[in-house]
Amino acid sequence: MTYARIQGVGSYIPQQILSNADLEKMVNTTDEWIMQRVGVRERHVIANSPDNTTTMAVDAAKRAIEMAGIDPAVIDMIIVGTATAEYYFPSTACLVQKHLNLREDIPAFDINAACAGFVYALSIADQYIRNEGAKHILVIGVDSLTKVVDWKDRSTCILFGDGAGAVILQAHKEPGILNTILHANGDYSDLITAKSGVWERESVPHLHMYGKEVFKLAVTKLGEIVDEIIEKSGLKQSDIDWLIPHQANLRIIEATAKRLGLPRERVILTIEQHGNTSAASIPLALDAAVRAGKIKRGDTLLLEAFGAGLAWGAALLKL
């Protein structure tokens, strides 16, 4: 049996840091209030730097390729999960292909599942390796949500940071991705929006979110999907070594960990330093944990994410 196994990870975050103390000067908020409500102390932001969605994706990809120890010429697919592409078209994936000078006989495309984008992209890549003969796939999660937040809205501007994370998936006989599950419900599409499309747009697109409703749904749906994927994989909660959640809200993360019976020290947390980086949050957290020596080859990881759409998903894998 052929598995898709993570061979290398990489990430990138902008240099500029926006702290809660900085936000206290911009909106009516406090460090104590932000930490208590969401668990964010600081976030990295593009601001006026030369960084953008494409450059961050490229830098994260380079680091993943370096860790994987592969020749970039062997990459036979690029999938980018992002909701904040630099352009309507071309895709971010094609721009990454250009900057990495990858060969042309490969598919490269973006998918938009907002904060769940990386898990969606990972699931698609897994199927291409299992069923279509792909050998090395570059999967990236990247977003620049600080470019669409309303800096006068204290309920949302405190949440988000910018960044990118990437993995190299390689076809392997040893177990890698065991299962993925993806769900969506468009009936809740108005709960998180940023209207910048062709047909309906704001002069300056801003992210709007009904936070209380999103919180309740996230706790419920993530709890259900982690139970579903563990059962589908024939495992027990005690088999999970690490939970790597989407870093959206500390209270949501704690609720999922409690449902799994996982102590806090078995949960990878970067929300305090990164904020919510949308599709980048899971690969950013994974990269940080691998490079810190926390997560090791053979560990069983549960990834889960929830975002606009509403779209949510989970992946269970052996590193």
UniProtKB/Swiss-Prot annotation:
Quaternary structure and interacting proteins, as annotated: Homodimer.
Q: Name one GO cellular component term.
A: cytoplasm
Enumerate the catalysed reactions: malonyl-[ACP] + acetyl-CoA + H(+) = 3-oxobutanoyl-[ACP] + CO2 + CoA
Q: In which pathway does it act?
A: Lipid metabolism; fatty acid biosynthesis
Which BP terms from GO are recorded? Answer: fatty acid biosynthetic process
Sorted keywords for this record are: Acyltransferase, Cytoplasm, Fatty acid biosynthesis, Fatty acid metabolism, Lipid biosynthesis, Lipid metabolism, Multifunctional enzyme, Transferase
User: Which Gene Ontology terms cover its molecular function?
Assistant: 3-oxoacyl-[acyl-carrier-protein] synthase activity; beta-ketoacyl-acyl-carrier-protein synthase III activity
- What is stated about domains? The last Arg residue of the ACP-binding site is essential for the weak association between ACP/AcpP and FabH.
* Official protein name in the record: Beta-ketoacyl-[acyl-carrier-protein] synthase III
Q: State which Enzyme Commission number(s) the record gives.
A: 2.3.1.180
Q: What is its main location?
A: cytoplasm
- CDD domains found in the cross-reference section: KAS_III
Protein family (similarity comment): Belongs to the thiolase-like superfamily. FabH family.
Gene3D superfamilies, per this entry? 3.40.47.10
Region (ACP-binding) location: 247-251
Q: Where is it located?
A: Cytoplasm
Any idea what job this protein has? Answer: Catalyzes the condensation reaction of fatty acid synthesis by the addition to an acyl acceptor of two carbons from malonyl-ACP. Catalyzes the first condensation reaction which initiates fatty acid synthesis and may therefore play a role in governing the total rate of fatty acid production. Possesses both acetoacetyl-ACP synthase and acetyl transacylase activities. Its substrate specificity determines the biosynthesis of branched-chain and/or straight-chain of fatty acids.
According to its UniProt record, which residues of this chain constitute the active site? C115, H246, N276
